[in-house]
Amino acid sequence: DPRTEACVFLYPKEATVPSFRVMRVSSGAVITRTQLIQLPMPDAIAVSLDKQAEHDVLDWDEATHSGKNTDNTCDNHVEDTGVDEVSRTATFLPSSETARRLTENVNTASTAQHVELIERERADEATHVHVQNQEHPNEESEREAVVQVDCTPTKSQPRRSQRVLDQESTREALESLNYWTEDMQVYALVTSSNMTCRQAESEHGSIATDSIEGELQQLVNKEFATPIPAAELTPEIIKGAIRSKMFVKQKMKPDGTIDKIKSRLVARGDQQDRTLYEGEDLSATTVTCMSVFSLLAIAAKEQRKVCTADVGGAYLNASMGTDGPPVYMSIEPSLASILSGMDSRYREAIRDNGTIIVRLDKCLYGCIESARKWQLNVMQTMSDNNMKPNAYDPCVLNKTCRDGAQLTIAVYVDDILMTSTNEEEMEELLQAIKNRYGDVKSHRGDVIEFLGMSVDMSTTGSASITMKGMEASIIEDATTERGTRKTNSPAADDIFDIDEDSPPLHNQERSEFHAMVARLLYLAKRVRPECLMAVSFLTTRVTKATKEDKMKLDRIINYLRDNDERGITLTPGAEGIVASGYFDAAYGIHEDGKSHTGACLTVGERGPVSVESTKQSIVTKSSTEAELVATSDSTNMLLHLRNFLTAQGYEQGPSTVYQDNMSCMSLIEKGRSTSKRTRHIAIRHFWTKEKVDTNEIIMVHRATEIMGPANVMTKPIHGAQFVNERKQLTNWE
């Protein structure tokens, strides 16, 4: 059962102590003995590959957790492929406790899964689940699963009807498992440190156990839910209860060392009925990376003190309220037993199968409305302390201190960044947050950690930002072998070439490729912008990755390995808090003839607060037109930065836009085409003419050699030129 990170098992009904047969999930590769040993199993599961054995379906998760009857599950995605496809037989003896539970639950699994058919279930019925995979017509060979629950009819029981999962429901079920690959393994796309309770206890022992118990104790202390006594449960409540899952995570420091083992109970919000929330605004914003870097540049320029705060169990401080539909959640037996020892109300609610069903009173991670309710809660707290949001980023709030100084905070879910020259009022706000939420950890100093980044403010007038820990974890997790020579640039000259004959990646390789590209994108957008051009191209290849794409990914990894411990430095300098932009384009560089845009925004003299490297949406007829499109698209970003800084109290004069194409600048100055060769250009690309006329931006020509902040993000560059342009971009010595 994917929801418990175990396989789907089949057992011979005549067995006294059930043995099991491993079956194939969806259309993926058949599990091998090696894979079987690597997969996390509930206790010591007995496994027997017996080709002739009659078998029924055993849903381990349903056998121990009576819950919602939903089609958004993966336990029915099974296809009997025969023992001939299994590479090797693996047989293990179950523990006595496992055998007892399996024997007790073996004939109640279907009953628990189909609550509405309880009266029709018989203890000796045989359930056969067949999955017929139909080839989807597109080139990616997506599968649409037709799930048929075929209960062998008896004289007293007719055959049941067929149930069908459409493609969207199947995909939602798969996506709810982080990333469920066809070879029956789970990969997180960005964070690879999440573990199940069993994995965490195996790896970290009592530390993980204490973390899990601490999370449950926090839930009880916060009165997160009301347990429903078993006698008061109705079929509607049982059917509508969503599942829950305890995850354990290694919380890492920016230097790559383990900070702590953190546990979190997560609700399966993907099982909630979204039709009940139609018309409601469930969106929740977080502070943008551009805003954070701009605030750090301001702090460096004005020599502000910087402080971070982390609100523990943030969502639990927000109430679910009574205006919406009640949310019922099922808690698995192992966690239910711990809760029952902490609060007698949970002991009275334990059901025959060991689970507990609760009604959520506080917001829990995973519920579709939790993020919105928490944001409203924390924003109200800030409003009560006279903090006013920035109109262009509501997660940035300010107030004027008694001495006239500005106090600024940025909120990213439960992480808060504070900057001010007035330490007294910064401490007052921090104390108010602690009084409101209780469990708040804070840190201040010349070196602070925020959102996985290490920010060094020890040098007057500058802020240096690195993510050494994430770089190290990417390199460690990569399957790339170190090259024989040092890799001095992240992309070869053929980065945009596509070899249609290159063999495609399958299953695990494709999943690992997708995960690694996602992690690199997160890194490149923040502290390694010189890699962004290569990474942005690979993001277009994740659904159809080939061996050639894997080689391009390997080069980026080797570049990081050979050029580690780098970052960016924000230095506003004498120019002050003013927005500037470097815009460039590489004409016709993609295989479909489209051009590539590179853009870098700065606050003050040097250091990127926002970078972009994207494929243009149209085919242009000349390099001049490509540069015009790049300037038109990127000016949007620059104007947003200007508006943000103005709302922060920094009046903006004309923002400088650096360009290396004189013909493009001439077109913008005239605001129209100047010859037969440019008459076809759409008028929408000339809107920047108005911004020049109103003196919001001024165009300044720069030679290509000193356009590094944008040039390095449009085309592959090597040698001394790359080193020089990388320095111009990152401002890192």
Regions found by a protein language model. Give the residues of each.
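A short, polar/acidic, helix/strand-boundary loop motif
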Residues: 273, 602-629
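Mobile genetic element proteins and their domesticated derivatives, centered on retroelements
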Residues: 8-10, 34-37, 161, 212, ...
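Catalytic palm active-site di-aspartate
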Residues: 308-313, 357-367, 391-420, 446-456, ...
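Conserved beta-strand/loop block within the catalytic cores
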Residues: 205, 210-293, 389-412, 454, ...
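C-terminal reverse transcriptase regions that engage the nucleic-acid substrate
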Residues: 293-296, 360, 368, 444-565, ...
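Retroelement integrase C-terminal DNA-binding domain
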Residues: 1-213, 217, 221-222, 424, ...
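Catalytic-core region of right-hand nucleic acid polymerases
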Residues: 223, 234, 243-368, 372-379, ...
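RNase H-like nuclease module associated with reverse transcription
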Residues: 578, 617-733
